[in-house]
Every structure is written in structure tokens, then in C-alpha cells.
């Protein structure tokens, strides 16, 4: 047991001063710290003031709050791992306290997986909105909180079942590296989440196609306006899901590849551990999504404004313009005739 501990301490020491691993820690620390004020601004100044229905807004707020809390957890983790080598006096002091590692990783994974599952709620809410377009905007905010509760409860149950028998007896030198006794279950859960996210993105594509087909059936100006609101909000959630899938998909594919190939492929435990630790793309996503979100909202709002203006304007050219002119003249003379004694 002592020999194993010594080998773990030696590995922690080599990782702490490995240039590639060290650079990845610094990058993750930097983007995590930058993403915190960026997400706070995005939530309080953009998401809170969206014109979307309360159900979708509630889902978006909780989704980005999960990202914010996860960024805070990552910021602490990477600051800790980056700075601790400057203050230790022995190699084994580089190992993370077991209790700190246990609760840090469980809470971090719960926030990470919750943010991966919450976009499923976007699809459910959007299909309900599309199916009840004529009266959905006047409905109360109830569906969103229910979906949030169910998704978080399911995710909590899965994470609890994964970690309930984990003894946490290994020496831990990184918050993002899963214990070997739990790694297979976490990998399986991530693999399932990847397929769920792909399926969810396909559902969003189907939703947008259905929207384009049925919106021509509505002639009421108010319903057409509601349909345009649903379309714009669905496009925004599509952008979020697509961006999340790119980053998360890359992370899962790379991590599974590293684990499947094993230590022999990377010529030793050190290179294998470096490969496992440097491909965490989630901190970068938490910063990039704010930039993409602000730009996409600006574009969609401009698109929405132009669409609404074109919808309420009366055309004055072509066959439709001629018909509008005749209708106006007819209505005018009918009103004059009705006032003539």
C-alpha cells in the first residue's frame, strides 16, 4: 500500500510540473474565471429580459445558472491545482484531500450532467408551445418548473447510484479525473448523454420544419405573431444545443478514445494521465456560449423586428396590393353609404 501511495505521489509531482498539463490547467483556470462574470451578466441582463414564454425562460435561467455554478466549481478546482505546487513541501501534499475531492467531484458532475439534460426540457416545452400556439402565450408558467424538477431529480438519482459504493480510497491529484472504480459507469453515462443530445438536436430540427409547414395555416395576425415568437425562441435554443453538442461531443469522444486505448498507447502512466486531463472543453464552452448567446439574440431580435414589421404592413404593389386598394375603397364607400340618410 505504501508503494502504491508513493507511486501516486510521484505521478502527482510529475503532472504538476508537466508543461502540457500545466498549460491546460492555466487555460482552464483562466476561462473559468472569465466565464463567471460573463455568465452573471448574460443571465441578469439578457436572459431575465427575454420576451420568451415563462416556461422556456425558467428553463433557460436554470440551465445557465447550472453553467455558472459549474464554472465556479471549476474555477476553484483549477486555481487549487495550479497554485498548490507553490506551497507544498513534499510530493504527497500535492494529493487532494479525500473529503474535498469527494464532494467537489460529485457536486461538479451533478451540475455538469444537469446542464446536459436540461436542453431536453427545451424540446418538450417547444413542442407543447407549437401544439398550443393559439393560446400558449396566455398560459401560466407551470410546465417549465415541473420539467426542471423531474430532470434534476432523475440526474441526481443517477449520480447517486454511480457514486454510492465508491470508497474514495485512491490518491487523487485532479478534480476532473474519475476514480478507477467508478470510471466505467461514468463513461457509460456520458456515452448515453451524448446520444441523448444528438437525438435532442434532431428533435429541434424536426420542430423547426414542422413550424415552417404549419405557420402558413394561420391567417390571424395575432396567431402569426405568436408563431413568429415560437420560431425565434426555438432557433435560440437550437443554437445553444448545437454549441453544447459540439463541445461536449468532442470531450466525450476524446475521453472515451483515451480510456479505450489505455496506457500502452501513450507510452506510460504519465502521458496517459496528461491525455485524460488536457481535453476538458467544458470551461471553454461556459465562456464561448455567452458570446454566441449575445450575438444570436441580437441577430434574432433584429430578424424578429423585421418580420413583424413586414407582417403588419399592407402591401401596395402587385396583385395583393391591388386587392388591398380595392378593399380599402370598398370599405370607405360602404361606410359613407351607411351614414347617408
UniProtKB/Swiss-Prot annotation:
Pfam families: 7TM_GPCR_Srb (PF02175). Keywords: Cell membrane, Cell projection, G-protein coupled receptor, Glycoprotein, Membrane, Receptor, Transducer, Transmembrane, Transmembrane helix. The chain crosses the membrane at residues 24-44, 59-79, 104-124, 142-162, 188-208, 238-258, 277-297. Expressed throughout the head. It comes from the Eukaryota. G-protein coupled receptor. This is Serpentine receptor class beta-3. It comes from Caenorhabditis elegans. The gene is srb-3.
Amino acid at each position: 500500500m505504501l508503494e502504491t501511495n508513493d507511486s501516486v505521489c510521484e505521478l502527482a509531482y510529475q503532472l504538476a510540473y508537466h508543461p502540457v498539463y500545466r498549460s491546460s490547467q492555466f487555460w482552464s483556470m483562466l476561462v473559468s474565471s472569465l466565464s463567471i462574470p460573463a455568465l452573471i451578466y448574460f443571465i441578469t441582463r439578457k436572459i431575465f429580459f427575454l420576451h420568451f414564454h415563462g416556461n422556456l425562460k425558467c428553463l433557460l435561467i436554470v440551465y445557465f445558472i447550472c453553467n455558472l455554478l459549474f464554472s465556479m466549481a471549476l474555477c476553484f478546482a483549477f486555481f487549487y491545482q495550479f497554485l498548490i505546487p507553490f506551497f507544498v513541501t513534499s510530493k504527497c501534499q500535492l494529493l487532494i484531500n479525500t473529503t474535498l475531492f469527494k464532494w467537489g467531484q460529485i457536486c461538479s458532475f451533478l451540475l455538469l450532467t444537469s446542464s446536459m439534460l436540461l436542453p431536453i426540457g427545451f424540446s418538450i416545452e417547444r413542442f407543447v408551445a407549437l401544439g398550443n400556439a393559439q393560446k400558449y402565450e396566455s398560459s401560466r408558467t407551470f410546465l417549465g418548473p415541473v420539467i426542471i424538477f423531474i430532470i434534476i431529480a432523475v440526474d441526481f438519482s443517477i449520480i447517486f447510484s454511480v457514486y454510492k459504493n465508491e470508497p474514495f480510497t485512491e490518491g487523487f491529484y485532479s478534480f476532473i479525473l474519475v476514480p478507477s472504480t467508478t470510471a466505467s459507469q461514468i463513461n457509460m453515462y456520458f456515452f448515453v448523454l451524448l446520444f441523448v443530445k444528438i437525438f435532442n438536436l434532431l428533435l429541434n430540427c424536426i420542430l423547426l420544419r414542422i413550424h415552417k409547414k404549419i405557420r402558413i395555416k394561420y391567417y390571424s395576425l395575432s396567431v402569426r405573431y405568436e408563431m413568429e415568437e415560437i420560431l425565434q425562441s426555438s432557433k435560440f435554443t437550437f443554437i445553444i444545443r448545437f454549441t453544447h453538442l459540439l463541445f461536449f461531443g468532442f470531450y466525450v469522444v476524446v475521453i472515451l478514445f483515451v480510456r479505450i486505448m489505455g496506457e500502452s498507447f501513450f507510452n506510460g502512466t504519465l502521458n496517459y494521465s496528461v491525455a485524460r486531463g488536457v481535453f476538458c472543453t467544458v470551461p471553454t464552452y461556459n465562456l464561448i456560449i455567452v458570446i454566441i448567446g449575445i450575438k444570436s439574440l441580437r441577430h434574432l431580435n433584429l430578424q424578429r423586428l423585421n418580420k413583424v414589421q413586414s407582417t403588419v404592413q399592407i402591401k401596395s404593389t402587385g396583385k395583393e396590393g391591388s386587392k388591398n386598394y380595392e378593399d380599402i375603397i370598398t370599405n370607405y364607400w360602404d361606410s359613407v353609404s351607411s351614414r347617408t340618410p
